[in-house]
UniProtKB/Swiss-Prot annotation:
Physiological role: Critical regulator of angiogenesis and endothelial cell (EC) migration. Promotes the migration of endothelial cells, which is essential for angiogenesis. May be involved in actin-dependent nuclear movement. May be involved in the organization of the nuclear envelope. May recruit Ran GTPase to the nuclear periphery.
TM annotation in the entry: 210-230, 297-317, 322-342, 353-373, 626-646
Keywords assigned by UniProt, alphabetized: Angiogenesis, Glycoprotein, Membrane, Nucleus, Transmembrane, Transmembrane helix
Top-level taxon: Eukaryota
Membrane topology (Perinuclear space): 231-296, 343-352, 647-651
One GO CC term, this protein: nuclear membrane
Nuclear topological domain: 1-209, 318-321, 374-625
Record region (Disordered): 469-525
Name the UniProt record assigns to this protein: Transmembrane protein 201
Length: 651
């Protein structure tokens, strides 16, 4: 050990060279760890059909079979499958599924104990579906255009009668309220689960053992420097008191004698304690103490290097403010020791005091950094806020979820309940002879949202049948059924009836320029509930009057406090201001509620992740830039001082 101390005294550049070599080794280890980072072997994905999560290999993230519904999940950018599936067009490859017929619940029995549609309309709907399923186009390249025109032709041929149209619209409006309550409850539950998962993932980061060991070594190095400084003050205190004893005031000699007696008692206790230890251990401890006292600059350099290595190896995920503060304090300690090395004998007393204070603070910060290895797992208490009309409703629902819970069952299956007063509504609607055409009917919007395969481009549904895009029944009463090939060619019907709706005529010309690709009639079903695109839920609120009811129900429902109940006997005359505007929840919430909430034009693998984009505030930006910048500045200044020291010693 003495030979090593002699070599270090004669060749001080070796200390700096060792520090530089250690820094290079730590940087190389960090670069090697980043370069050899392994990719994930497995990935959690979400089924597009049943909305169930499962774990698949990373290479099969876009081509896998769901273990729950046995459906293949692998899509291209245009929404089609990324491989051919023969079972879609070959009947012998499909296997039948048999199940017992469930008993019809009592809630599905109507008030008048009859079906929703009459016998004639029910048969017409069956014929319409069969003819649409057996459609064969003239040209395969124009399949989309021909199926649109043929669907329009069937809708004009098989129309609903006036009472059935009234019953269907009333039932759809009632079911719309039930589904809206169910979707609200589902969205609130998913938001709460996502918040809990985010808090759990944020605060459950474990600290490695080697990182804790580096922080402990940093604290021990600083504690050793503080102990050496305190021992130096204790050794100098008798001489100071001896110079003061030459004064004239006698009481000071008495105080000095008392202090000397206390010091003697403390030294005796320390000697007794040291006598209990083995002599070899005491000798090694004294040798270590003497070596550290003679090379305090090396100890401080080791402490700084250990602190910076721990910060760099921890990574940006575990970067804390206390680590940045500790690195800055270590830099100040190194600066004071460098100043002492240059001043050598002419060291002022104030510099010693400042150095001791900085070293003590650095020791306390290092102890706090070594002890505080984990963050608190307690969740912050949610603060109640008042909802404003211009704000985002997602935050309001997160804090006030129980107040707006829908009174529907928590089961996954949804059983619609019959609308109230259906028989009275039918009698009232049969007595009316005028019909008010609504600008955008709800069946058309539901048909665009709940569709088997291709979403039609029809924007209006003013007639009395389930499919959208036809003329009102009052205007088409005298016109004969038109041939769908004449509609395809663009010719007008011979009768003086009105022309087809602009959406149908526009669909023939607008889709001709698009990419014509043959695709099956029944493609994977889509449920689009984003109110912004399809306008499934109307936003304006209009009062509903029972004194003069229109022949068909208005499309705008007043969303008041009783709108969530399954049975509503009558509507109030007042226009109640709802807690939220209809459709605003689905327009402002950018996060999809599940895989089935995405339309066909979504990109591939959009159903396997929930991306939440949020704009960080100025506090988050300050926290992300200030502390890494402070750490970088500390490291840069430290390397600059080391380079200057090496230059002046080797020159």
């Amino acid at each position: 050990m003495e030979a090593l101390n002699q070599i270090l005294i004669e060749y001080p550049p070796l200390v700096v060279g060792g520090v530089g070599a250690t820094a290079v080794a730590a940087g190389g280890a960090l670069i090697y760890r980043i370069a050899t980072r392994k990719k994930p072997t497995h990935l959690q994905v979400n089924c597009w059909f049943c909305n169930q999560d499962t774990v698949v290999p990373y290479g099969n993230r876009n081509c896998w079979d769901c273990p729950y519904c046995e459906q293949y999940n692998g899509f291209q950018e245009n929404g089609d499958y990324n491989k051919p599936i023969p079972a879609q067009y070959m009947e012998h490859l499909n296997h039948g599924v048999s199940a017992g017929v469930p008993e019809t619940p009592k809630t599905l029995q109507w008030v008048n104990c009859q079906m929703l549609l009459c016998k004639k309309c029910n048969n017409n709907q069956t014929l319409k579906i069969k003819q649409l399923a057996s459609f064969i186009p003239r040209e395969d390249e124009n399949y989309d255009e021909e199926i649109e025109v043929y669907k329009h032709h069937l809708e004009q041929t098989y129309k609903l009668c006036r009472p059935c149209q009234t019953a269907v619209e009333y039932y759809i409006k009632h079911q719309n309220r039930q589904l809206r309550a169910l979707l609200f409850n589902h969205q609130l539950r998913r938001t709460r689960d996502a918040d809990k998962a985010f808090i759990k993932n944020t605060y459950s980061l474990s600290t490695p053992a080697w990182l804790i060991l580096l922080r402990i070594l940093t604290f021990l190095a600083c504690a050793f420097l503080v102990a050496v400084a305190l021992s130096g003050y204790v050794d100098e205190s008798p001489s100071v008191t001896q110079t003061l004893s030459g004064g004239v005031v006698p009481p000071k000699r008495v105080l000095q004698n008392e202090n000397e007696s206390k010091t003697d008692e403390g030294s005796l206790m320390w000697d007794d304690l040291m006598g209990l230890l083995p002599e070899k251990a005491v000798e090694n401890a004294r040798l270590f103490w003497q070596s550290g006292s003679d090379h305090q600059m090396a100890v401080a350099s080791v402490g700084l290097l250990t602190c910076i290595t721990g910060v760099l190896m921890a990574g940006p995920v575990r970067l804390r403010r206390i680590d940045a503060v500790a690195s800055v304090l270590w830099l100040l300690v190194i600066c004071f020791y460098l100043a002492e090395c240059y001043l050598k004998t002419d060291v002022p007393s104030w510099l010693e005091m400042v150095k001791f204070g900085i070293t003590s603070v650095c020791c306390l910060v290092g102890f706090a950094a070594a002890v505080a290895t984990r963050k608190s797992t307690s969740q912050r208490r949610a603060r109640g806020r008042r909802y404003l009309s211009g704000g985002s409703p997602g935050e309001f629902f997160c804090n006030h979820g129980p107040l707006l819970s829908a009174p529907v069952s928590e089961s996954s299956t949804f059983i619609p309940t019959p609308p109230p007063n259906l028989s009275q509504l039918l009698i009232r609607q049969q007595s009316q002879r005028t019909r008010k055409a609504s600008p955008s009917s709800l069946p058309g919007r539901l048909n665009r949202a709940l569709s088997l395969g291709t979403i039609p481009s029809l924007a209006r549904a003013d007639s009395g049948f389930l499919f959208s895009g036809s003329r009102p029944s009052s205007q088409c009463k005298d016109s004969p059924p038109s041939d769908y090939y004449s509609l395809k060619s663009g010719s007008r019907p011979s009768s003086p009836g009105p022309s087809p709706t602009p959406s149908v005529a526009g669909s023939v010309t607008s889709t001709s320029s698009s990419a014509r690709q043959r695709r099956p009639l029944i493609s994977p079903a889509r449920l689009n509930i984003s109110g912004q695109k399809l306008r499934l839920f109307s936003s304006p609120l209009e009062p509903f009057s029972l004194a003069s009811p229109p022949p068909f129900l208005s499309e705008h429902n007043p969303m008041h406090s009783r709108g969530f109940l399954p049975d509503v006997p009558h509507f109030h005359l007042q226009n109640h201001g709802s807690v939220i505007d209809e459709g605003s929840v689905f327009e402002h919430l950018e996060k999809p509620m599940g895989s089935s909430s995405s339309s066909s034009n979504c990109h591939v693998d959009t159903t396997t992740g929930n991306n939440i984009e949020s704009k960080p505030g100025w506090k988050g930006f300050l926290g992300m830039t200030l502390w890494p910048g402070l750490l970088f500045a500390s490291l840069t200044i430290n390397l600059s001082f080391i380079c200057i020291y090496v230059y002046y010693n080797w020159r």
